Regions:
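Terminal domain-initiation and capping elements
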Residues: 1-197
Length: 197
């Protein structure tokens, strides 16, 4: 899941930069230009892990990464085999243990938590209340994001929402959309608690 979503994210990034949809300034990641995320959720924690995985992938070559690793108190582990094949990485048990420790520590940093709260938490509320959503998860995540951000008073008009979808056959797709002014007429009538009874 994580590897396929990252590949799809890289393809989205390449297209977004090539077409001028997003223009990166010095020290920026494409994740800085996505206001909210709604992703495929086999379960809620997978969304949290997916965000951590994407942020690590995007931030590790930026100046902010040294501040992240300083807060964690360790450098990001590196696999022994420089080829970086999935087989060599999975076979490197010392790396896998260290990487899991690093991921957990990263998810406790202020950098991750600030981004998570700002860009993803609201899209996971429905999953927390309903449970596993599988096929409908990305769209239920969007509904959750819209409803809970609306209740917080967030104006989503003009905001970019990044979508990450994963399907059978180990394939993934990443795309984005911009919230239009008419969303308010739809979202003001949403009541997830009432709808799920």
């Amino acid at each position: 899941y994580l590897i396929q979503v990252r590949k799809a994210f890289d393809a989205y990034k390449e297209k977004a930069l090539k077409t001028g949809l997003v223009k990166l300034n010095e020290g920026e990641a494409i994740t800085d230009h996505i206001d909210f995320f709604s992703v495929h959720l086999p379960y809620r924690r997978m969304g949290e892990k997916a965000l951590a995985y994407l942020l690590r992938h995007e931030w590790r070559h930026l100046p902010r990464w040294k501040h992240v690793t300083k807060e964690i108190g360790m450098n990001e582990p590196q696999p022994k085999d420089p080829r970086g094949t999935i087989e060599s990485i999975l076979a490197d048990t010392d790396f896998m243990k260290a990487d899991e420790q690093f991921r957990r520590a990263f998810m406790q940093t202020s950098f991750y938590n600030e981004t998570y709260e700002k860009k993803m938490a609201s899209s996971l509320e429905a999953s927390a209340q309903i449970g596993n959503l599988y096929t409908a998860s990305m769209y239920m995540g969007l509904r959750s994001l819209l409803e809970f951000e609306f209740k917080k008073g967030t104006d989503l008009e003009g905001k970019r929402i990044g979508f990450g979808s994963y399907g059978s056959g180990s394939s993934a797709m990443v795309f984005s959309g911009i919230m239009q002014p008419t969303y308010k007429y739809i979202v003001k009538g949403m009541d997830l608690q009432n709808d799920i009874g």
